[in-house]
Amino acid sequence: AKGTKAVGAAVDVGDGEALVKFVNETASALGGLDIFVSNVSGAMMGGIDEATWRKGFEVDILGTVRGCETALPYLEKSGAGSIVVVGTVAAVENAGPRRAYSGIKAAILPYIKSLAQNLAPKNVRANVVSPGSIYFKGGVWEMIEKNMPERYKATLARNPMGRMGKPEEIANAVVFLASPAASFVSGAPLIVAGALTQRIY
């Protein structure tokens, strides 16, 4: 409506060839890439068996890596490229029994830090947004609220703000890091969790 070109397609990020094709075709259709946002999850949640770890590696880690690495040549040409990966607060804070989920997501942090330091001379930034519990209709927390109300209440009670986040609050953080407003921010894990974490940094 405002003269902005948009392209879209369904793609399985666990399918390496399909993801690489999607990124390349999107860049071609748009005439390049200035921003790449990776919001990938195999929804491992509470699984701890080897199959869960393998799925997390294929989808969450390789899905992120393949997307970022494929986008890099376009971002380098941009002159002000930005990568934003949506992670989770579970990567920096003990998340109870979700060992596979936390471990897999934690692996993204040093990868993005490495990208940030190596790409800085090429004017490409890389950052992570780490959301806490986010509530939206049809989401996992709505399901937990209905089926496990005590767990839902306990999660709310743990957060000093007394509520869960909203999708738009995560989107705002992503937009900030992707934009020129964050032009001197790179290699940063931005936690968006309502003062939930106990870490000093």
Please place each PLM-identified region on the residue numbering.
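Residue(s) in the substrate-gating loop at a strand-loop-helix junction
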Residues: 88
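A glycine/serine/threonine-rich, flexible loop-to-helix segment
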Residues: 121, 134-158, 199-201
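Substrate-binding pocket helix/loop in short-chain dehydrogenase/reductase
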Residues: 44-57, 155
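Active-site helix of classical SDR
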Residues: 68, 104, 112
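Alpha-helical segment proximal to the catalytic Tyr-Lys
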Residues: 73, 117-121, 183
